[in-house]
Amino acid sequence: MAGNLVSWACKLCRSPEGFGPISFYGDFTQCFIDGVILNLSAIFMITFGIRDLVNLCKKKHSGIKYRRNWIIVSRMALVLLEIAFVSLASLNISKEEAENFTIVSQYASTMLSLFVALALHWIEYDRSVVANTVLLFYWLFETFGNFAKLINILIRHTYEGIWYSGQTGFILTLFQVITCASILLLEALPKKPLMPHQHIHQTLTRRKPNPYDSANIFSRITFSWMSGLMKTGYEKYLVEADLYKLPRNFSSEELSQKLEKNWENELKQKSNPSLSWAICRTFGSKMLLAAFFKAIHDVLAFTQPQLLRILIKFVTDYNSERQDDHSSLQGFENNHPQKLPIVRGFLIAFAMFLVGFTQTSVLHQYFLNVFNTGMYIKSALTALIYQKSLVLSNEASGLSSTGDIVNLMSVDVQKLQDLTQWLNLIWSGPFQIIICLYSLYKLLGNSMWVGVIILVIMMPLNSFLMRIQKKLQKSQMKYKDERTRVISEILNNIKSLKLYAWEKPYREKLEEVRNNKELKNLTKLGCYMAVTSFQFNIVPFLVSCCTFAVFVYTEDRALTTDLVFPALTLFNLLSFPLMIIPMVLNSFIEASVSIGRLFTFFTNEELQPDSVQRLPKVKNIGDVAINIGDDATFLWQRKPEYKVALKNINFQAKKGNLTCIVGKVGSGKTALLSCMLGDLFRVKGFATVHGSVAYVSQVPWIMNGTVKENILFGHRYDAEFYEKTIKACALTIDLAILMDGDKTLVGEKGISLSGGQKARLSLARAVYARADTYLLDDPLAAVDEHVARHLIEHVLGPNGLLHTKTKVLATNKVSALSIADSIALLDNGEITQQGTYDEITKDADSPLWKLLNNYGKKNNGKSNEFGDSSESSVRESSIPVEGELEQLQKLNDLDFGNSDAISLRRASDATLGSIDFGDDENIAKREHREQGKVKWNIYLEYAKACNPKSVCVFILFIVISMFLSVMGNVWLKHWSEVNSRYGSNPNAARYLAIYFALGIGSALATLIQTIVLWVFCTIHASKYLHNLMTNSVLRAPMTFFETTPIGRILNRFSNDIYKVDALLGRTFSQFFVNAVKVTFTITVICATTWQFIFIIIPLSVFYIYYQQYYLRTSRELRRLDSITRSPIYSHFQETLGGLATVRGYSQQKRFSHINQCRIDNNMSAFYPSINANRWLAYRLELIGSIIILGAATLSVFRLKQGTLTAGMVGLSLSYALQITQTLNWIVRMTVEVETNIVSVERIKEYADLKSEAPLIVEGHRPPKEWPSQGDIKFNNYSTRYRPELDLVLKHINIHIKPNEKVGIVGRTGAGKSSLTLALFRMIEASEGNIVIDNIAINEIGLYDLRHKLSIIPQDSQVFEGTVRENIDPINQYTDEAIWRALELSHLKEHVLSMSNDGLDAQLTEGGGNLSVGQRQLLCLARAMLVPSKILVLDEATAAVDVETDKVVQETIRTAFKDRTILTIAHRLNTIMDSDRIIVLDNGKVAEFDSPGQLLSDNKSLFYSLCMEAGLVNEN
């Protein structure tokens, strides 16, 4: 069949050379050029050109007017000129050529295709933004075909002295080459629009459109579209504004929706859903396209050894021919009796270059597609994790801590992204091995089967090693989660840690997980990786050695150079898939673990969708807006055995009414509000809520942004109502005090605000939302009495802003009950009594009446309580009508791909500052980033962390390994040349033994090198750097935590530490290995052909230039990637902390949208970063192809001089063929080193933070019993929170005597909490000092000060762990002492009821299984244990009910009667029995005297405060 086809082709051709395709000279035959290359080019144009013409004619005009400049005119003129040349050429053909069908058909088809091209050029110029792909490829094929024709004519004229087609034909062909190349160049040039629409677009979007969208096919293949950004990065330091928009179809919103749809289909349609399959269905098409490119690349990779063999055979034959001019030429046809032409060698060399060049182009299209797929997966999964976290049930939230979910985002998603780089190698590796083995079979015959046997034997060992590594990898992820959980908890509770001086025990807890679990496991993992690496290094050598051994003893042929070096090249090609397979398997193992973790998270239980039914709002005052009935029962978790949260609930709240819920600590007040939000699991009854909801949590959730952003909360700004809200929530004075007013940054969790300010800010957010229903969880607890009265009157009362709304208030503020329309008493999760205020006051035996009678101001009625208030700042004629309040104006759906996305992202990075693209230094503290090249001292710091001696040993063994490997190949060259000389295989045993010894030595050196890397370098550095950063962060002052989002710090402990642990050592290793390999390769080539040095010097200049040109841009892009990633985690952590609030306001979509914008912002830095890598790699691999061309061409040139043997050519080119791949790896590893060393730079930045004062000052340590008296003196004391801020305490001069009980009062922001922080040196003195028992506290260490004082802080922070660990983390006290403390703090009963573990009962993250009141009591228990003479109570019982408060206050009086007590309290009645009262006003001591003395003066500030609290009256 094949013979018939050849015969038929020859008849069509009628050429003495035949159809070919390769001629005797090594070029294409004329028939092949005309009949195949040029004919196919024309058919391609006719077929696809007409298709594009039709499509463009149907397409609407793009709307962009292009200038009719010289480019289009030149194109059209040149096409017409090409038509003329083809016409002249067709007229110039001879009679013989006219009978040649291939020539005639070529001219006919070319002429037709040119007219199609002419029409397409004209139409596409106006109707397409991108240069037409069909035209580009057509002119490329035409240029190539005509150039091949030109070479064909020249070679035959040189060797045969004949002008085929005549001299005229040659000149016309030359002109055709020039014309086609010119048109190709002009078509590739970008078009210039008549209107500068891109600049307008850029102004509107604040981001430049991505040039990838408008780049032509060649620009995309060569990554030239990146050149603009590369140039910008070379000329200046890149900032976010320099980045492009993401290309089309890259938005995380679009990607996550596709993945979510497929995941939901999996859940619906399958009993065993697969997350992997959902990901494959969503993004598999891109991976298939990548697979197509990879297959082409792999085939081309194995073409090179065949070309090498042809070249060596040519060299052998040429040398043989020179030695014996009469010898016959074997392998060629008899009609070519002349000598072997040297041009054939040059053409083989050029073919090797062309294959290498094509290989590079295809490889990087493969990489582009896999990296894009990785981006898609990362964006989609990150967005889905965020969305899932918004709907997790309480039970699922308990299973997944914040640290766990952050790890899913930062580590597990990253592992899946990394997997995309390796995924195609799972088939490509075996495919390469099969091609390689087949090629070896064709080369060496049956002896290659021994190699197959070795590979099969190694498989079980490989499988065993992989199983162990998978097990260790699972453990590694578990320990990583545990460490992240501990560090997350430390950061969230850092204030308590410092107040209690618990830094040391918690640092030890963290180091226990890090050093004794995580790093120990990583050491084992490193050792197994070293064994795996040794196995895969020795396998290719064993295969080659055994194959050669079997060959020399079984085959009758000599093992000559034309067999050895192609075989050696194939063995080198075999080593890549064998080397990469363990990485692939390791990546698969890591990804499978991560997929399992993500699957578990995505299948976690969600909130019960019908827990509460949301209905349209009610219209009339008095209509039921909240209805819970049929003895409704709710659980915190779905498990039936779990403790019931609420039972037998029958509850109603009406529009326009205020319904109050009261009860003891832990009675279920918060649970009742949670069930209305839908956060609990309903097992019985029903629950309905009408209209929109606004929720104020008991612990105010404040976003890391400005005051204004916290109030607006995504709603449109309404200046008039905003002002009303500010006044009603008593924030006017606070905003006047704050430096930037409502533009002041409040810090993470509102850390720069007092408790009262946070409570009122949270309430203002609810008021401004203008919802239908308000669920308020004790917002009055953290505010002073007079502020509480203001809020009751102007917000909650009958004349307040919310008088027409449905209001449910859980409270312990008895004064609020008097204005309630309905009151419900909860006890142990059950409503025991409910009714109106009048009904309760009539029943003298009811529990509620007793509560009011004993602790509240008795009022027979409620009508006049606030009627005569003089403060009617909000109640003027400005109370808005119902309709006005309902105008809830949300932000429009903005195109966040454009300007607003950037604004949000910029704001998020600036701790959610202003929604403004510009940098405002007052609003934003952006994350610091270094600029320019990573300083050498960072590399030295890492080398020092790795242990310099170990680093030297590591590099030494790399050099030894590579030297032995090269010597093995040199020995093979020598052996094969001996065999060629003798025509047999003499002394085979001796040659094999030496070759074997060199190979084993090289593999053993690699094993030692890898063990040294992991065990003695990487682990050492990981431990050192983590310890350094941990110590520094724990010792940082509170100002650092106030101005730095926790997510940003956590990013350093998770992402940056992960890079140091897992990536940095590996990348340094591969960089050094490949750098040494390139050095040896160039040395071998230069030793073989010394002239090569004249090629390598200019190429090295280009190489270094490109690398440096690139590194400037890449470095900044990687830093921007790191910096834009931090806000994702910060926002995520912040959201998890305020889930109830986000869900309460139904803001899930908005918050998901913000998250997606932040992801897109991060991707807009990551996308150019990976493409910059491709941009450089493409250019450097082109240099690698030129090295192959240079080495091969010089070999042929020296052959002509008669100074080169086949062995030298084989050795030189076998190394040259490796250099492209090696250069590629050097580029990648240079990038990875630069990228990952930035993590060391970032860790070092946090390791060098400004520290607090020393923990211990030797020589100034106080006595053990200090303070023995409790005497406190403030001497002209002033302080501020940060150097740039105003003083918060001014010239304080007070003396508190031993055992004195002192109350501290003042309006919000007066400086009450600042006074206690000053006592603990959380803020340092700006002037003056504090003296305790005759020792100035600024002279002693912080540990000696803080652990000697006792405090119950305003923010009651609880750690994940046991009750014992929370109360006594140092294990300093006995169980009896701890139980006694719990008993005195009224928590013993609750702890016993939690589980049978007693003091080992588990508390969840943040004390989630305790109420806020119980958390405060736990802090009280801590204080009970510390035998300090000084106790500070900072609103210690603000969140407990009145009855518990009374008992606790009594306990404090008796248990601490011999101590000095400073009490800050909003309930003024709790400090009325103090010895003296400090009244603070604007940071100064306004009054300091006994309560009686201060009350006797009705003009005193204290008197007015008591008056407002209802503790005194005017009579």
Swiss-Prot record:
Domain ABC transmembrane type-1 per the UniProt entry, residue ranges: 287-590, 951-1235
Main location: membrane
Xref: SUPFAM superfamilies: ABC transporter transmembrane region (SSF90123), P-loop containing nucleoside triphosphate hydrolases (SSF52540)
Positions in the Vacuolar compartment: 1-32, 95-99, 152-169, 300-345, 444-446, 552-572, 965-1001, 1088, 1202-1205
Catalytic activity: Cd(2+)(in) + ATP + H2O = Cd(2+)(out) + ADP + phosphate + H(+); an S-substituted glutathione(in) + ATP + H2O = an S-substituted glutathione(out) + ADP + phosphate + H(+)
EC number: 7.2.2.2, 7.6.2.3
Subcellular location: Vacuole membrane
Pfam families in alphabetical order: ABC_membrane (PF00664), ABC_tran (PF00005), TMD0_ABC (PF24357)
UniProt keyword Chloroplast present: no
GO MF term (any one): ABC-type glutathione S-conjugate transporter activity
Sites bearing Phosphothreonine, chain numbering: 911
All residue ranges annotated as the ABC transporter domain in the record: 626-853, 1272-1507
Modified residue annotations for Phosphoserine: 251, 873, 903, 908, 914
Signal peptide (residue range): none
Role: Cooperates for the ATP-dependent vacuolar transport of bilirubin and glutathione conjugates.
Family indicated by similarity: Belongs to the ABC transporter superfamily. ABCC family. Conjugate transporter (TC 3.A.1.208) subfamily.
Miscellaneous comment as given in the Swiss-Prot or TrEMBL entry: Present with 396 molecules/cell in log phase SD medium.
Name of the protein described by the UniProt record: Metal resistance protein YCF1
Protein source organism: Saccharomyces cerevisiae (strain ATCC 204508 / S288c) (Baker's yeast)
